[in-house]
UniProtKB/Swiss-Prot annotation:
Origin: domain of life: Eukaryota
PANTHER family listed in its UniProt record: MELANOCORTIN-2 RECEPTOR ACCESSORY PROTEIN, MELANOCORTIN-2 RECEPTOR ACCESSORY PROTEIN 2
Phosphoserine PTM sites in chain numbering: S94
Protein name, entry field: Melanocortin-2 receptor accessory protein
Native source organism of the sequence: Mus musculus
UniProt record similarity statement: Belongs to the MRAP family.
């Protein structure tokens, strides 16, 4: 009760529940927006939210921690900064592969000399 000391005063506040209220019947043919367009709008908003979430997570993964950014590790071929510069990245990668064609072969030869398991497997013998 609102006033616990005086029991003679009636309580005048009411609680309304959705179960007790009769909702207004709606005829779907009289709606200004088609029911299919409402569903399409909901799906588009969900897809927009998912794309936005993906872009936020992608941006967060690009930024990295301050310790990773200032570490003395060698710079990768494509340093993905806050701006997306794909043509420059592809051009750098193609220049590095065309300038040093013998370097990779030397690395493969070094691997085969170091461990016999790194060599290419031969044909399998059938029983």
């Amino acid at each position: 009760m609102a006033n616990g000391t005086d029991a003679s005063v009636p309580l005048t506040s009411y609680e309304y529940y959705l179960d007790y209220i009769d909702l207004i019947p709606v005829d779907e043919k009289k709606l200004k927006a088609n029911k299919h367009s409402i569903v399409i709008a909901l799906w588009l908003s969900l897809a927009t939210f998912v794309v936005l979430l993906f872009l936020i997570l992608l941006y967060m993964s690009w930024s990295g921690s301050p310790q990773m950014r200032h570490s003395p590790q060698p710079q990768p071929i494509c340093s993905w900064t806050h701006s997306f510069n794909l043509p420059l990245c592809l051009r750098r990668a193609s220049l590095q592969t065309t300038e040093e064609p013998g370097r990779r072969a030397g690395t493969d030869q070094w691997l085969t000399q170091q461990s016999p398991s790194a060599s290419a497997p031969g044909p399998l013998a059938l029983p």
